[in-house]
Amino acid sequence: MDRTTQAVTEELTSGRVQRAAAMARKYMPGKPSDAFTNAADSFHDAMADYGEDVKGDFSAQGRLEEIPISLEAPIRKVKEAAAALVQLINADDEIIDPDENAERARVKGAVQEIATTAGKLLKMGNEHVLWYEPTFSTLHLAPLSVSHVLRSNLLTQNPVIATSATLTVGNNFDAMARSIGFVVGSDADEEIKPGEIDPANLQMLDVGSPFDFANQGV
């Protein structure tokens, strides 16, 4: 679960944005890449100012309820400039040289990642948690639950055997199964696409424990 959460956690730093902007400017010089560079520089300045403002304020260095006001506009400009640049790169379909195609894919991937992350930060809902990490001046966005990620990318695609040393809750594993992404009980009304495995087709088995909890429990 922790590894899945880490894998889907979004991170945005000014350094990453500026590196993507530098790649784009080298690959596709012009006003669109200049706009992205300017947006990246503005975001860098805004993050630096925010970092200075929250020094010593530990309440602003951990979890945030929303994007800080001073960062919202710079992030929006980054997202819009990056998205516009991705559209231009997609429209550049005349490249036939394999090396140039590879370079385009690399630049597009870097810029698209920035656009996607910035967009998710701006649309953050109650199902996500946002926090600021001051050491590397980083914004992190992570889902509170990864059950939907595991369900759509794993449980509906492959048969899964899940094992856990976790004790049952209420004499069953329903809570644990739901946290992994299985569909349990009254939840089993989701539409399954053709070719997918039904995540409600679940068998649970408690094999007991070799420990005598009454005498060996701490």
Which residues fall in each region the model found?
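Conserved coupling segment at the C-terminus of the helicase ATP-binding
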Residues: 1-218
